[in-house]
Each structure stands twice: as structure tokens, then as C-alpha cells.
């Protein structure tokens, strides 16, 4: 009876086309701020529940009926019940006695909070069990998360089955699920067809309700809120031991055996010890367990031990059938879902690792997690929507939490339908068709998609080329580059910049040499070798990463007090004025016509997206949106570039004539100033035409158009370079925020993130150096931690693995400066007298130790 889950095979092309029609209509409704299609909000008026079949359970139970002041989202002191944001909750008013084999009739309206899953009963349904109890409605707790199993489970409705047979003469099951109603509504078919069960109209209207002030931007904020909060749900999955009798593996090493799969420690792992492509994990499931989710914990830093493709089989004995085939994102550190939404018990589930990254021979898995239907999927937790959780989302503040909860439920339904067809739309869909364009308009919703990461990985893998047969060797003079950075006017052609030295060094030496295509596998993590003139380094990756960091700093300097040494980007007006948001950002220079180099910048961005390296470019969302193909708007995006101008035009639009003439007189002409301080005419001869009061609307539109398109050609060149390296389908699947993060890394370097990425070697757990190290990093600012990260790894953003060893001189020195080797991302940590001294030495090294002397080898070439 359940509809196809994400990634499931749809029953027919008719069903696929119907869902695409639905998505197009829903996308238009979302963009326009209209209610979503009614089929998406379907709630059956009647659902039957019975006691869960548990031989050890009681033969009857008393089900308390709770009453609230209307449906709400809070739990009061009276007990675990749905409630409202105002007024006290009432305690349980009565109880329904339910014996094994008997049923209780409820509506299909559900609510989930911290106490569990609730279903609603109408006055008529209550009367069947309690007579005239005086309640207008009541709520039953179907299951609690802590109970480990559902007390009540839904069943088919015999009355509905009988009525359908009498009415249509066909033995149809009633359509009770919203997915089926969507298919019935939007899929064209001949002949008789099932009919949906009677809808609970009041619940449908509550789901469809859109507040008068609600906009598409509110939906986007709600999606980001869910993305930020639901990302942690997999951390709370039940222990595998609840559902599995035993776990067998194909092979294992003595130190990293099968117990590491269930120890809830991401630092340990099971490692195989066998033949290539012959690795498996076999789960013997406990009787009655139905898998809702099966997740594997993987880590991209395992390199060629990381699984790349997993196939899951299930069944009984040796009669196993293929259930799923999953490609894993090679950049992932965390959980990947390899099986979900099973409807029957599978005695045996076998996870076969058919391919590892870079054709690795053995595999590492850091954990297995299971969510079972014995512990029913409760759904979205209404407790999320408390005012304290909404502070970062001003558009959502002030909206009734009940409204936010229902809207979120509806958006999750939309995402589920989108997931079921996404692999049909990307990458094979014709981009010229209107339907695809409409779905792209709601790209931010892809954040919640479960299918997208696998599709992105597949598109990148299918378009990658083999690694180059040789590694380019570049000779870089950073002393000249630093002199140029200090005074760019002495070198107008920017020949001494690291950027130019690398660009020229990578040019093919003759017509037979192919230029780099940057589409190599992610494992190929050093694109060229650097020889820094007059610096001690043998480049095994650290010098290369340093060259990328130097180019990033030249393109978009991190300090507002230094000149911009290259002509490709200029500071935003916000940075120059010290006003508005995003005061450290840059935009492409409208005057720079060197499109070949812009295209190369785009290629470097694509290479960073494909690999593990970063090109840190401080560009506002206004630019990233254009690169990823998302729409930009004046009111939403341009304040990050020039907030003063946006405000000025807004005020000008509402001015009366007297104020306008007093403010501008005859001085305002049809011209505007671009980000590079170039004055351009908005109309032919505009510099000599005064803007009158009646012309102001036209003037405003012309200014907005000119500024929005000021760097259109430069962005187009960058995008052309990006698309030479990354398929269009990948840009279609990534939001602009994700594109920025994949190219530039995560600007927030938190201590928690560093803890996950740091490995201490040859240290005792009680060693004071470990304690002092973390105390020091806790006292660092984000900028300090970013500088420290670059000192150790050559990267200034996460993720980047760090290996820490004791100082080479051991106990002979105290309070010395730390040393690092960026090629191996290694820090050599000395002894310190206190955490304060440790903090001072680490900070000094992070800001002052630029040359990479510890990479010098005694064997010179």
C-alpha cells in the first residue's frame, strides 16, 4: 500500500510523467506564494489502528485520551500531549480500553513531538468508545520513542474495502496514502481506477494554509532551518544490536575487526583483509525487524579504502535479491543511506562493497546504523519550532509554530516526490524543456534530497578523465610576488604575482602538448609541483597547496588595508564604505577584459569542487548564484554588494516631488557608478540629461539593470571555465551555498570540527600537551584557527586532516616554537609550561612562520 520511496522504481512511465506534472505545478505555486496542490496535503478521514503483535505484550491496554486547547506544539506539565502556545493544557480526560485483535478508529491527522507520535480522534470516533464524554476531539499516543516499538499500528479499513467493492465491483484497496493520491490526480490512465478514501477536510485545509505575509523566501528559510536541524537525526538512530542477531564479514584484520562496526566510535573501523571486490557485511536480522533505514559510516580520509559503490541484497538463506545499488560521494565524512523503506522482514541483509575509491583492494567501514519499523519512524518533531530555535531566521520569527510545523510537513512531502523522480531528471533531462526550468526555480529545496549526493558523485565520476601522465613543475619566486603585493603599481602587468607565474608556467610548451583539463579523479590531489625559489621545500603537496592559498590571497585579499594586486576582482561598495552586510567581499571587475584568465579561474574552481583542495574566493551570493544558474534579484542579492545604493533607490521611489527636487535638483543625471568606480551612461547621452521627478521610476529600473549586469561577461567567462571541468548536471543539483563551500571550503573553523579531523600519534591520553593544545585552540578566534590550519596543512579552510606528533627533540626543549610539514599535514608539538604559553607559541607560528623549512630533505635533486 505504501508509495514508492526515494530512489524506488516507479511502476510505469505514466506514473513518472504524472509526478513530473505535479512537481511543475507545485514549483509554480511555491514561487508565487500560493497554496500547494491539494493532493499533496491529503489526510484520510479514517484510519484503523490495532495493538502491535508482540507475544510478550499485554492482551489489553488502556489508552489515555488527551485534550488540548486545540492542536498545538508544546507539552505542558499536565503530561505528554499536543498543546497550544498559550493557556494551560488539560490532563487526560478518559481512557479507551483496547484488547488484542480489536481496533480503534481515528483520523489520519498525526502530530509528532518529543513524547512520540499522536493521532487525532473526532467527536464521533470518541463516542464509539466513550459515549457522550463531552470532548470535541482527543489525541492518542500511538508510540513513544523510548519504548522501542509501536503500541499501535495502522491496518486496512474493512468498511472501506467493502464499500469500494460494492460501488465499483472491483476488489480495489482504498487509496489512503498521500503519495497515491498525487499519482491518481496527475497520472493519466484508461479504464477504471481506484478512488481515494474520504479526506479529512479540516486537516487538509490546515496543511494547505499559507499566512497572508508568507513568501517563497519564507519557504527557503524553512528549508534551511530543517537542513540545519535534521542533519543530526541520524546521530540518534537506535543501536544495531536491537535489531541484529549477528554480524559476519568477508574478512578482517586482527586490530580492526567486526566489533568496530557497532562501537559507535567514528575513529575505529572494520578493515577487510581479502581480495579486491570480494568484501561483504552480512546482517542476520532479529525476527520481525523491518528496516526503515540502513546507513554506513564512511570517511573520505580513508583514501582508497573508502567504499565507492555498494550493492545491498536481502532475503532468506541463499535466495538473496538485489535491493539497492548506491554510489557514495567520495568527499563524504559521515553516514550514507544504502537501504530504506523496506515493507517486509528480511532475515538476511548482505552489504556488498563492489568498488573502492581508486580501485582500492581492501575496504574500511566506520559503522553500521539501523532504523527499524519496530521503532516506527515518528516523522518531523514539532518541538523543533520553538522561538529560541528561530533566532537565525527572522522571516520565520513571529509565525505560529503550529503553522511552521504543518508547512514543514508539506515541504517534506514535496521533497519525497522530487526524490522519487530526480534520477530521471538529472542528468538526462532536456534542459530546454519548461518543466525542468520550473523545478530548477526551487533549487534550494534540494538541500533535503536524499538522492542528490549519489547523483552528484555519479555525474562527476562519469565525466572524469585519467590523471595526467606527468606533473607540471613550476618555479615560483614568492619574494617578487610579495613585493608586487605590497606595491602593485610597480608591476602593472602583474607578471610577478604567483597567479601569473602559475598561469604562464602551465601553458603548453608546444602545439602538441595538451593543456590540463582539471577533470582528473579526486584522488589526484596535487595538480602541479612547486619549486619556491630561495625557499627550502621538496613539494609533496604542501608547496602546491601553498600556491593555491597565495593565488586566493592575491585574487581576494583577506585584509581590507592592503591593495588588490590583481585586476580580476574589486572590493564591493560595502567593503569600501564599511556599511551593510558582507563587508569583506569582492565582485568581478567590470573593466577587466582578460576573459581567458577568468575562464582559467573557473577551471580552478571546478578542479577544487572535484578534489580536496580549495580556492578561497570571497565572493557574495550575488556572484555564486549566477555561477550556479540561480536567479538573482535586486532586493534580495544586491544589498550584499552595495547596500547604500539599494536603500537610496528604495527611498527615492517613495519620495514626494518637493523632497526629490530639494535632494537632487538638477544634479541627478542618467548615469551610474559601477563597482570599479567607472561612470556609465544609462541611456545615450545620459550624462547630459537631468532625471526629473516623473523619470525616477525609469531611472531606478535602469540603474538596477546596469548594476545587476555590470560583470555579466566576466561571470559568464568564469562559468564557461567551470563547465569545462564540472558537468552542467552537477551545477543543477548544487545550491549556490554548496557550490561556494565545495570550492572555498568551510569558513567556520570550529574546535569541534578540528577534533574530528585531528589524530594524535605517539601521545598518551593524559599527556599535558594534548590538553594544552585544545585549550589553546578554544581560546583562538576563527581567524586564528584558520591561520593555524594553513600553517599545518597549507589549507585555510575545512575539511583538512591534521596529524600531531611529539616534538622531534622530545623532552630536551620546552616552550619552543612548533614545527609543521604541510606536505603531510603534520604538526610537531613541543612541551609547554602552561596552556597560555602553548596558545602564544601556536598563534605566533600561525601568523609568522611562512617558509616551509621542515619540508627540506637532505637529498637534494
UniProtKB/Swiss-Prot annotation:
It comes from the Eukaryota. Pfam families: ANAPC10, HECT. Pathway: Protein modification; protein ubiquitination. Keywords: Acetylation, Cytoplasm, Phosphoprotein, Transferase, Ubl conjugation pathway. It catalyses: S-ubiquitinyl-[E2 ubiquitin-conjugating enzyme]-L-cysteine + [acceptor protein]-L-lysine = [E2 ubiquitin-conjugating enzyme]-L-cysteine + N(6)-ubiquitinyl-[acceptor protein]-L-lysine. It is an enzyme of class 2 (transferase). The modification Phosphoserine is found at residue 12. The active site is at 823 (glycyl thioester intermediate). Residues 219-397 form the DOC domain. Residues 512-857 form the HECT domain. GO terms for biological process: proteasome-mediated ubiquitin-dependent protein catabolic process; protein ubiquitination. InterPro entries: APC_su10/DOC_dom, Galactose-bd-like_sf, HECT_dom, Hect_E3_ubiquitin_ligase, HECTD3. It is found in: Cytoplasm, Perinuclear region. Its main location: cytoplasm. Its EC number is 2.3.2.26. The keyword Acetylation applies. Coiled coil: none annotated. CDD domains: APC10-HECTD3. Interacts with TRIOBP. Interacts with STX8. E3 ubiquitin ligases accepts ubiquitin from an E2 ubiquitin-conjugating enzyme in the form of a thioester and then directly transfers the ubiquitin to targeted substrates. Mediates ubiquitination of TRIOBP and its subsequent proteasomal degradation, thus facilitating cell cycle progression by regulating the turn-over of TRIOBP. Mediates also ubiquitination of STX8. This is E3 ubiquitin-protein ligase HECTD3. It comes from Homo sapiens.
Amino acid at each position: 500500500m505504501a508509495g514508492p520511496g526515494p530512489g524506488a522504481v516507479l511502476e510505469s512511465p505514466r506514473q513518472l510523467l504524472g509526478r513530473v506534472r505535479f512537481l511543475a505545478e507545485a514549483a509554480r505555486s511555491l514561487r508565487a506564494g500560493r497554496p500547494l496542490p491539494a493532493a499533496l496535503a491529503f489526510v484520510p478521514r479514517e484510519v484503523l489502528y490495532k495493538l502491535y503483535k508482540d507475544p510478550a505484550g499485554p492482551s489489553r491496554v488502556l489508552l489515555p485520551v488527551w485534550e488540548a486547547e486545540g492542536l498545538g506544539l508544546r507539552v505542558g506539565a499536565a503530561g505528554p500531549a499536543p498543546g497550544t502556545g498559550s493557556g494551560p493544557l488539560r490532563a487526560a480526560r478518559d481512557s479507551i480500553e483496547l484488547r488484542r485483535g480489536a481496533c480503534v478508529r481515528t483520523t489520519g491527522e498525526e502530530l509528532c513531538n518529543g513524547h512520540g507520535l499522536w493521532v487525532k480522534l473526532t467527536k464521533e470516533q470518541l463516542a464509539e468508545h466513550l459515549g457522550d464524554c463531552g470532548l470535541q476531539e482527543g489525541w492518542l499516543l500511538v508510540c513513544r520513542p523510548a519504548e522501542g516499538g509501536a503500541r499501535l499500528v495502522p491496518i486496512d479499513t474493512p468498511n472501506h474495502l467493502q464499500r469500494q467493492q460494492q460501488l465499483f465491483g472491483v476488489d480495489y484497496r482504498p487509496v489512503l496514502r498521500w503519495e497515491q493520491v498525487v499519482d491518481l490526480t496527475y497520472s493519466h490512465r484508461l479504464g477504471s481506477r481506484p478512488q481515494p478514501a474520504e479526506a479529512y477536510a479540516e486537516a487538509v485545509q490546515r496543511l494547505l494554509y499559507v499566512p497572508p505575509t508568507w513568501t517563497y523566501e519564507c519557504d527557503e528559510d524553512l528549508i534551511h532551518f530543517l537542513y540545519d536541524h535534521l542533519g543530526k537525526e541520524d546521530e540518534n538512530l537506535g543501536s544495531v544490536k536491537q535489531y541484529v542477531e549477528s554480524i559476519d564479514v568477508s574478512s578482517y584484520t586482527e586490530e580492526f575487526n567486526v566489533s568496530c562496526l557497532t562501537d559507535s566510535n567514528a575513529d575505529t573501523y572494520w578493515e577487510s583483509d581479502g581480495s579486491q571486490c570480494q568484501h561483504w557485511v552480512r546482517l542476520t536480522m532479529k525476527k520481525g525487524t523491518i528496516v526503515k533505514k540502513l546507513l554506513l559510516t564512511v570517511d573520505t580520509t580513508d583514501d582508497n579504502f573508502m567504499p565507492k559503490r555498494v550493492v545491498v541484497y536481502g532475503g532468506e538463506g541463499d535466495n538473496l535479491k538485489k535491493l539497492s545499488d548506491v554510489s557514495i560521494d567520495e568527499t563524504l565524512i559521515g553516514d550514507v543511506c544504502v537501504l530504506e523503506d523496506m515493507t517486509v522482514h528480511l532475515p538476511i541483509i548482505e552489504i556488498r562493497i563492489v568498488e573502492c575509491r581508486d580501485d582500492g583492494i581492501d575496504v574500511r567501514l566506520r559503522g553500521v546504523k539501523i532504523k527499524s519499523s519496530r521503532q516506527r519512524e515518528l516523522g518531523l518533531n514539532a518541538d523543533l519550532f520553538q522561538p529560541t530555535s528561530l533566532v537565525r531566521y527572522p522571516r520565520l520569527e513571529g509565525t505560529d509554530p503550529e503553522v511552521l510545523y504543518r508547512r514543514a510537513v508539506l515541504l517534506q512531502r514535496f521533497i519525497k516526490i522530487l526524490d522519487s523522480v530526480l534520477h530521471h531528471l538529472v542528468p538526462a533531462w532536456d534542459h530546454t524543456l519548461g518543466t525542468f526550468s520550473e523545478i530548477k526555480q526551487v533549487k534550494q529545496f534540494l538541500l533535503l534530497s536524499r538522492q542528490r549526493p549519489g547523483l552528484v558523485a555519479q555525474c562527476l565520476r562519469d565525466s572524469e578523465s585519467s590523471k595526467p601522465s606527468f606533473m607540471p613543475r613550476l618555479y615560483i619566486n614568492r619574494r617578487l610576488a610579495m613585493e608586487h603585493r605590497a606595491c602593485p603599481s610597480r608591476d602593472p602587468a602583474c607578471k610577478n604575482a604567483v597567479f601569473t607565474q602559475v598561469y604562464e608556467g602551465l601553458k603548453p610548451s608546444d602545439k602538441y602538448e595538451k593543456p590540463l583539463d582539471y577533470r582528473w579523479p579526486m584522488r589526484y590531489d596535487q595538480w602541479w609541483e612547486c619549486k619556491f625559489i630561495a625557499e627550502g621545500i621538496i613539494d609533496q603537496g604542501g608547496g602546491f597547496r601553498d600556491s593555491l592559498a597565495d593565488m586566493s590571497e592575491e585574487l581576494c585579499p583577506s585584509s581590507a588595508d592592503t591593495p588588490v594586486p590583481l585586476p580580476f576582482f574589486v572590493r564591493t561598495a560595502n567593503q569600501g564604505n564599511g556599511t551593510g552586510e558582507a563587508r569583506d567581499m569582492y565582485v568581478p571587475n567590470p573593466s577587466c577584459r582578460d576573459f581567458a584568465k577568468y575562464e582559467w579561474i573557473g577551471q580552478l574552481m571546478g578542479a577544487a569542487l572535484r578534489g580536496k583542495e580549495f580556492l578561497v574566493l570571497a565572493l557574495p551570493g550575488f556572484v555564486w548564484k549566477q555561477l550556479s544558474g540561480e536567479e538573482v534579484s535586486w532586493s534580495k542579492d544586491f544589498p550584499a554588494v552595495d547596500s547604500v545604493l539599494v536603500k537610496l533607490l528604495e527611498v527615492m521611489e517613495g519620495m514626494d516631488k518637493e523632497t526629490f527636487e530639494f535632494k537632487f535638483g538638477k544634479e541627478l543625471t542618467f548615469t551610474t557608478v559601477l563597482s570599479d568606480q567607472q561612470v556609465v551612461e544609462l541611456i545615450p547621452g545620459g550624462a547630459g540629461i537631468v532625471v526629473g521627478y516623473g523619470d525616477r521610476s525609469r531611472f531606478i529600473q535602469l540603474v538596477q539593470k546596469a548594476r545587476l549586469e555590470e560583470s555579466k561577461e566576466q561571470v559568464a567567462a568564469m562559468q564557461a571555465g567551470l563547465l569545462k571541468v564540472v558537468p552542467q548536471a552537477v551545477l543543477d543539483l548544487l545550491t549556490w551555498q554548496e557550490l561556494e563551500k565545495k570550492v572555498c571550503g568551510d569558513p567556520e573553523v570550529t574546535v569541534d570540527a578540528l577534533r574530528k579531523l585531528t589524530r594524535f600519534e605517539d601521545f598518551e591520553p593524559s599527556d599535558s600537551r594534548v590538553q594544552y593544545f585544545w585549550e589553546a585552540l578554544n581560546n583562538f578566534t576563527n581567524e586564528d584557527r584558520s591561520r593555524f590550519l594553513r600553517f599545518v596543512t597549507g589549507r585555510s579552510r575545512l575539511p583538512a586532516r591534521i596529524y600531531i606528533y611529539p616534538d622531534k627533540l622530545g623532552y630536551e626543549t620546552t616552550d619552543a616554537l612548533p614545527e609543521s610539514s604541510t606536505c603531510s599535514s603534520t604538526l610537531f608539538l613541543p612541551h609547554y609550561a602552561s596552556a597560555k604559553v602553548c596558545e602564544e607559541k601556536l598563534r605566533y607560528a600561525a601568523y609568522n612562520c611562512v617558509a616551509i623549512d621542515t619540508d627540506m630533505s637532505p637529498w637534494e635533486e
